[in-house]
Amino acid sequence: MYAVIATGGKQYKVQEGDAIYVEKIAAEVDSTIELNEVLAVSKEDGLVLGKPVVEGAKVVAKVEAQGKSKKIIVFKYKRKKDYRRKRGHRQAYTKLVIEKIQA
């Protein structure tokens, strides 16, 4: 059984026991959260698609870690004009472990 969920503007195909990295969610480490935006659920009798979400379906996940990804360097440069700009960015993420899919 798998589900397609949407969080942080992205979609993820998940199964029970999967670990996924999503955009930062404001939750404590080792807490349990419910993801209610379930777009599709695969059951024994077939695939159930939501319009736009599946009614009554939710995915329960445990927050395993909060962190930042690798640094991305953005460097702007204009020749002959003595213009240089160097910026760094580290995107915050949340690591989730899928515990249960309820549909």
Swiss-Prot record:
Gene Ontology cellular-component annotations: cytoplasm; ribonucleoprotein complex; ribosome
Pfam families: Ribosomal_L21p
Similarity section: Belongs to the bacterial ribosomal protein bL21 family.
Matches recorded under InterPro entries: bL21-like (IPR028909), bL21-like_sf (IPR036164), Ribosomal_bL21 (IPR001787), Ribosomal_bL21_CS (IPR018258)
Keyword vocabulary terms for this entry: Ribonucleoprotein, Ribosomal protein, RNA-binding, rRNA-binding
This protein's name: Large ribosomal subunit protein bL21
Source organism per UniProt: Clostridium acetobutylicum (strain ATCC 824 / DSM 792 / JCM 1419 / IAM 19013 / LMG 5710 / NBRC 13948 / NRRL B-527 / VKM B-1787 / 2291 / W)
Function of the protein: This protein binds to 23S rRNA in the presence of protein L20.
One of the protein's GO biological processes: translation
MF term (GO), any: rRNA binding
Subunit structure and binding partners: Part of the 50S ribosomal subunit. Contacts protein L20.
Taxonomy, superkingdom: Bacteria
